[in-house]
Amino acid sequence: MPHSSPGAPLDPVAFIHSQIRTVPDWPQPGVQFRDITTLLQSPKALRILVDLFVERYVDAKLDYVAGLDARGFIIAPIVAYELSVGFVPIRKVGKLPYKTRSESYDLEYGSATVEIHEDACKPGDRVIIMDDLIATGGTMMAGRNLLQRLGAEVVEGAAIIDLPDLGGSTLLRNAGLPVYTVTEFAGH
């Protein structure tokens, strides 16, 4: 963690970056897992992180913040609360109790599906979609597609971390979804 002299201004992005733990070779050899639990354990880091998102979206005239299962559920409801807007969960298949719409997407080995309640938002609602991290972009793209199928205007995709070497943020931008991330890490 970088040290600063007393009274020196804090660089919020550098501070957030320093609070994320890297776990080598998890969940499989060669993967550098970016663990946000250390960031969440620090009241100061959590406050700074939430403030960064709130400052970005306070004037965006949002109706909802959508969070992607599972780690997107951690930060998205806090940001929604701070912005005084609703929270929309986008869950893994089979986890929502009411009528749903689903969207499948490809993974490196296989595929996955996410769902949203069919009444989660209405045409014209302005929504941002949040997750902890953007890697390949598949989950966020599927979430964006679900929200658009309900008629929502997806204003932006937001995450704490970008892994640009995996191409997800570029894929999302090329598909017309603006992306905001607080920090990035090289590699995967």
Swiss-Prot record:
Question: Does the keyword section mention Transferase?
Answer: yes
Mention one GO biological process in which this protein takes part, according to its record: purine ribonucleoside salvage
Question: What SUPFAM superfamilies is this protein classified in?
Answer: PRTase-like (SSF53271)
Q: Which reaction does it catalyse?
A: AMP + diphosphate = 5-phospho-alpha-D-ribose 1-diphosphate + adenine
* A GO term for molecular function: adenine phosphoribosyltransferase activity
- Keywords linked to the UniProt accession: Cytoplasm, Glycosyltransferase, Purine salvage, Transferase
Q: In which pathway does it act?
A: Purine metabolism; AMP biosynthesis via salvage pathway; AMP from adenine: step 1/1
Q: Where in the cell is it found?
A: Cytoplasm
Q: Which GO terms describe its cellular component?
A: cytosol
Xref: CDD domains: PRTases_typeI
The EC number(s) given in the record are 2.4.2.7
Entry-linked NCBIfam families? apt (TIGR01090), PRK02304.1-3 (NF002634), PRK02304.1-5 (NF002636)
What family is it from? Belongs to the purine/pyrimidine phosphoribosyltransferase family.
Functionally, this protein is described as follows: Catalyzes a salvage reaction resulting in the formation of AMP, that is energically less costly than de novo synthesis.
**Quaternary context:** Homodimer.
According to UniProt, the name of this protein is: Adenine phosphoribosyltransferase
Taxonomic classification: Bacteria, Pseudomonadati, Pseudomonadota, Betaproteobacteria, Burkholderiales
Q: Which gene encodes it?
A: apt
